[in-house]
């Protein structure tokens, strides 16, 4: 078997940049890492509770965290920020208070900014949420994968590969099904590839969804 590496980590420094930007002493590193995880979990939980969508898509593509001595800057890249802001003008303020409570940060300022992604379905995280929603509502996996590919075609992508693993359609034996459209050159480091692994809980058990999207070469 070929040894598979995470396409994002493989391309760090060429086409991919870090989602967390901060420095710390080695003894405080673990603490900083846990803090990042807390911020991300807190934001995801808040968005999950406060956005109601028919397709089950929360629309968070990624959360970037930049830390300085007295400031934590959080940038949330969302596909559909309207869902969070539209019906609640205080949405971002509430989120900020929630995160501050979770972190217990007294002497540091917290800034949260939300930016919109131009083509939401060109992002694997949002696409995985869409497929997960379809699988939960018992749509056949092939139909869900084809619909996802149709959505990415509107987002001007060069290629996509989707893989679903587990007890598909409630079958006794777990298996892996995958579909590819266009080119997905995983070995080319200069190829800009976005990747996501997502788990979805269905009534039959847990399914794993992996998505690779090829955006073009740099």
Curated annotation (Swiss-Prot):
<dbReference type="InterPro" id="IPR001351">
    <property type="entry name" value="Ribosomal_uS3_C"/>
</dbReference>
<protein>
    <recommendedName>
        <fullName>Small ribosomal subunit protein uS3c</fullName>
    </recommendedName>
</protein>
<keyword id="KW-0687">Ribonucleoprotein</keyword>
<dbReference type="GO" id="GO:0019843">
    <property type="term" value="F:rRNA binding"/>
</dbReference>
<feature type="domain" description="KH type-2">
    <location>
        <begin position="47"/>
        <end position="118"/>
    </location>
</feature>
<keyword id="KW-0150">Chloroplast</keyword>
<keyword id="KW-0694">RNA-binding</keyword>
<keyword id="KW-0934">Plastid</keyword>
<dbReference type="GO" id="GO:0022627">
    <property type="term" value="C:cytosolic small ribosomal subunit"/>
</dbReference>
<dbReference type="InterPro" id="IPR009019">
    <property type="entry name" value="KH_sf_prok-type"/>
</dbReference>
<dbReference type="InterPro" id="IPR036419">
    <property type="entry name" value="Ribosomal_S3_C_sf"/>
</dbReference>
<dbReference type="Pfam" id="PF00189">
    <property type="entry name" value="Ribosomal_S3_C"/>
</dbReference>
<comment type="function">
    <text>Component of the chloroplast ribosome (chloro-ribosome), a dedicated translation machinery responsible for the synthesis of chloroplast genome-encoded proteins, including proteins of the transcription and translation machinery and components of the photosynthetic apparatus.</text>
</comment>
<dbReference type="GO" id="GO:0009507">
    <property type="term" value="C:chloroplast"/>
</dbReference>
<keyword id="KW-0689">Ribosomal protein</keyword>
<dbReference type="InterPro" id="IPR004044">
    <property type="entry name" value="KH_dom_type_2"/>
</dbReference>
<dbReference type="InterPro" id="IPR015946">
    <property type="entry name" value="KH_dom-like_a/b"/>
</dbReference>
<dbReference type="GO" id="GO:0003735">
    <property type="term" value="F:structural constituent of ribosome"/>
</dbReference>
<comment type="similarity">
    <text>Belongs to the universal ribosomal protein uS3 family.</text>
</comment>
<dbReference type="GO" id="GO:0006412">
    <property type="term" value="P:translation"/>
</dbReference>
<keyword id="KW-0699">rRNA-binding</keyword>
<dbReference type="InterPro" id="IPR005704">
    <property type="entry name" value="Ribosomal_uS3_bac-typ"/>
</dbReference>
<dbReference type="InterPro" id="IPR018280">
    <property type="entry name" value="Ribosomal_uS3_CS"/>
</dbReference>
<comment type="subunit">
    <text>Component of the chloroplast small ribosomal subunit (SSU). Mature 70S chloroplast ribosomes of higher plants consist of a small (30S) and a large (50S) subunit. The 30S small subunit contains 1 molecule of ribosomal RNA (16S rRNA) and 24 different proteins. The 50S large subunit contains 3 rRNA molecules (23S, 5S and 4.5S rRNA) and 33 different proteins.</text>
</comment>
